């Protein structure tokens, strides 16, 4: 549905050229909620602007619905953009206008008949649960309500792709969760493919099925959320994952184990998906004849799957030559 292949983009800066994107490739399939995560300056916003044709490439290709954007003329590009909705970090609403006017604006600009506009605005207001706010001025709304208006506006053209640029970063945690649930509902009930950028791994954890990690204009890691969370490879990915799944062994636990008379090494056991149902620790005790004490554990839900990380001390006499990590 969305293919970015070997994309390169540079900008002229005060101190010379800035390489915003370097050989970036991603593939978003129909029905995905695909997250692009990275710190500021990683190239996330540039990438998403390429997908809706707001930026052009130096080299590489961007293909949406089988159409290579670089080969389209302006009328063709405008037609394609009608199927792509956009949700912004700072809402981009007309504060002095009503909720109705803001949502209707894309249809007004397209000269859609008034009766059709009324019908569509009513439909999307019901979907985003703002029916009672139709005649309220945007300036009177909360941040979460403003973002719902922004989402409703993006849905008026019946898009099959929704691009979200840090759509929750200006919101409090409770409102963020509500907006993410709404995006998931849009994906599930409307069949809209979502490409979102964020610097919050919790956002990826809650709704994405795939993720690409960006650093300094490059995609350093990409794959299913389960794979990336379960086996992060790049250092920046590990830092992001640790904000959600803390599998680091605290110094206090290491010190506690060192105080014991026996010599122990602290180990991690990681269980993903159906393996959480298996009595692995019980089997270790039975087969190896050792006593295991669980010093710590974390449990996270990832796309209807469970990932558990256990921290436990094991006697040196029963250790393998390498660290235990059971990705079962």
Please tell me what each predicted stretch does:
Residues 1, 10-23, 73-76:
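A short, flexible loop at the N-terminus of ABC-type nucleotide-binding domains that lies
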Residues 52:
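Helix-to-loop junction immediately C-terminal to a conserved catalytic motif
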Residues 67-68, 104, 108, 115-132:
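Conserved ABC ATPase "signature" region
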Residues 97-104:
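Short coil-to-helix segment of the ABC ATPase nucleotide-binding domain corresponding to the Q-loop/switch region
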Residues 136-139, 157, 164:
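Conserved signature/switch motifs of ABC ATPase nucleotide-binding domains
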Residues 168, 317-324:
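Conserved small/polar residues in nucleotide/adenosyl-binding loops
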Residues 204-206:
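A short, surface-exposed alpha-helical micro-motif characterized by mixed small hydrophobic
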């Amino acid at each position: 549905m969305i293919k970015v292949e070997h994309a390169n983009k540079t900008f002229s800066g005060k101190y010379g050229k800035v390489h915003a994107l370097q050989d970036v490739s991603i593939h978003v399939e129909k029905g995905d909620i695909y997250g692009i995560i990275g710190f500021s300056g990683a190239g996330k916003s540039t990438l998403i602007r390429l997908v809706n044709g707001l930026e052009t490439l130096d080299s590489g290709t961007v293909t949406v619905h089988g159409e290579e954007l670089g080969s389209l003329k302006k009328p063709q590009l405008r037609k394609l953009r009608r199927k792509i909705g956009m949700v912004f970090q700072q809402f981009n609403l007309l504060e002095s206008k009503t909720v109705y006017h803001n949502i209707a604006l894309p249809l007004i600009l397209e000269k859609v008949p008034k009766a059709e506009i009324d019908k569509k605005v009513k439909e999307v207001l019901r979907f985003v649960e703002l029916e009672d706010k139709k005649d309220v001025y945007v300036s009177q709304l909360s941040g979460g309500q403003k973002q719902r208006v922004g989402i409703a506006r993006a849905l008026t053209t019946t898009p099959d792709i929704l691009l979200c640029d840090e759509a929750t970063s200006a919101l409090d945690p409770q409102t963020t969760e509500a907006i993410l649930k709404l995006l998931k509902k849009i994906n599930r009930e409307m069949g809209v493919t979502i490409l979102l950028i964020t610097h919050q791994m919790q956002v990826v954890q809650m709704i994405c099925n795939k993720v690409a990690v960006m650093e300094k204009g490059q995609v350093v890691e990409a794959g299913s959320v389960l794979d990336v969370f379960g086996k992060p490879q790049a250092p920046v990915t590990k830092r992001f994952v640790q904000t959600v799944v803390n599998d680091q062994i605290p110094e206090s636990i290491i010190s506690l184990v060192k105080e014991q008379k026996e010599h122990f090494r602290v180990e991690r056991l990681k269980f993903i998906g159906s393996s959480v149902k298996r009595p692995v620790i019980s089997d270790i005790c039975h087969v190896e004849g050792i006593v295991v004490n669980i010093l710590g554990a974390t449990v996270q839900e990832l796309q209807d799957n469970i990932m558990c990380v256990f921290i436990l001390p094991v006697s040196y006499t029963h250790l393998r030559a390498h660290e235990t990590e059971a990705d079962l």
